[in-house]
Structures are given as C-alpha cells and as structure tokens.
Amino acid sequence: MDNQFQSSKPIYLQIADQIFYRLVRKELLPGDKLPSVREMAIQTKVNPNTIQRTYSEMERLGIVETRRGQGTFIAEKAEIVDELKDKLTREVLEGFVKQMKELGLTKEEMLEGIKTFTEGG
C-alpha cells in the first residue's frame, strides 16, 4: 500500500480512501478479508490505533464488517462498489472543476481539454 500521506487530510481517512480505490478497481471484492489491524499497521507504517480508526470508520459507512474472532471483511453488499465509484468520481470531478475554474477555464474549454487529452492529443 502506498504510504505517502498528505498533511491536508487525516491519515485514517487516506488509508480508507486507498482501500476504497482498491475496491473500485476490483483488487478487493465483497467478502474479502482485510489484513489484521497489526498487519495493516506494519504495511502502512502507522500506529495500530490509526488502522483501528480506519476500520471503525469503514464499518460505520457499511463498507466493512467485523466478525468477532475472524477479522474485518469487505461487506457483501453488491451496491457498495457502485456507490463508492460514484462517490470517488464525484470527489475527483469536483476537485478538477474547481482547479480549472481557478485557471479561468469555461465549461466548454474544460470539455474540449478533456476530449483532447483522452484522445491522446
């Protein structure tokens, strides 16, 4: 897992985002077991309390479920991945549009730029 964290967002949320991206890319699937808190802390080089907070937040959001004595698993709800994809897409687009507006681009210029970029131009 990439552990270069930004200072602008709490680390536990950045780790959750990394897991969300893995879910959307289908690197993790509903029912998959996540590493234990200790294992994830070692992988990400953060305090186990940070990982516990990450897992608790994801459980609060319904993304994971903790099974006593077994560990933490991706929730087996089919709609989770679609909801996450929509949420992450919206966040990326909001950031993109905000930055483009700060540069003074119009909606048409943004769309033309996207078209040119995606067509390899």
From Swiss-Prot:
PROSITE patterns: HTH_GNTR (PS50949). Pfam families: GntR (PF00392). Residues 9-77 form the HTH gntR-type domain. GO terms for molecular function: DNA binding; DNA-binding transcription factor activity. Keywords: DNA-binding, Transcription, Transcription regulation. Residues 37-56 bind DNA. InterPro entries: Tscrpt_reg_HTH_GntR (IPR000524), WH-like_DNA-bd_sf (IPR036388), WH_DNA-bd_sf (IPR036390). The keyword Cell wall biogenesis/degradation does not apply. The keyword Transcription applies. This is Uncharacterized HTH-type transcriptional regulator YhcF. It comes from Bacillus subtilis (strain 168). The gene is yhcF.
